[in-house]
Amino acid sequence: FDHPAEVQTLLAPFTTHRFFIYGITELSSPVDKGHLHLRPYSRSGFLRDLEDCNGVICGAGFELAGEALQLGKKLLVKPLRGQFEQLSNALALEKLQLARVMQRLDRKAVQLWLELPPNVPAGYPDTAQLITVWIENDHWQDIGSLSQEAWAQTGRVPRWDGR
């Protein structure tokens, strides 16, 4: 993970936005530095701030990115170096136009991301029910129809560029 001081340096110029930076192990209580709000681990505080925010800047792991998308938060991810899963997730999020990606802490990427409009919440389908109906209707050879139905229910049909 990036050092909290580097993250603060990255976000410091954007004084018209408030940033809540979580997981700072050196802190035992919250510290506010103007528009930068430094927070120790707090599940309840984190969930409250996640619900109230406009967007999330995070690693490209699945859990937080998925929560942010489900809540309709715009997303800027930075894959952790050497983590193949995170590189793969970042590529998928970018190709599906669900997130912006930065490979390093990049002030210009943050600025462009901050200018984006908010996302809409992702409506994830009941995939177990979709699969049940798909099998019951003997459509198991046509995985494309299952995929299309699931994506249609999210309201975010992916746009692949063929690569």
Residue ranges and their predicted role:
Residues 111-163:
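C-terminal amphipathic helix plus adjacent low-complexity
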Residues 17, 56, 99, 119-120:
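A general structural signal for well-ordered secondary-structure junctions
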Residues 40-41, 74-116:
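Nucleotide-sugar donor-binding patch of glycosyltransferase catalytic domains
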Residues 66-67, 84-88, 102-107, 122-127, ...:
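A general structural signal for short secondary-structure boundary/capping elements
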Residues 46-88:
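A donor-sugar binding/catalytic signature common to diverse glycosyltransferases
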Residues 6-13, 67, 71, 113:
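A short acidic, amphipathic alpha-helical/loop segment
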Residues 1-55:
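Donor-nucleotide binding loops and adjacent catalytic segments primarily
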